């Protein structure tokens, strides 16, 4: 009867991770839309918010490259708005690292499937940024519902 119990989770992730999430088609999603968000508004602090990928180390040359790319993306997003673009048009320069909020609802069978793929890596190594959110969520959920999730083992938890 796993299909009759559900769980809803709010993820705060980057757009790249959100694209991984929505591949789980049996979930239901509500996601913040860059089409209607105008990041030049006070509501957003007149800036874009990005999430540093977990594989970039602060102080490294790769981090510096990424950070500069994020600054350029923000600069040209606002330039396009100032030059007359709508937020829908200007969003074309926004990076995958842009923060988004996604509310995900699914039945317990689908959450088991999600954790097997995205936390335990049963079909191969999951995307590192997806693991970064899936593993802590799995550990929390397994703690509350060991009967439902106790048989799923993480590579580092035997």
Regions found by a protein language model. Give the residues of each.
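Family-specific signature for flavin-dependent thymidylate synthase
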Residues: 1-158
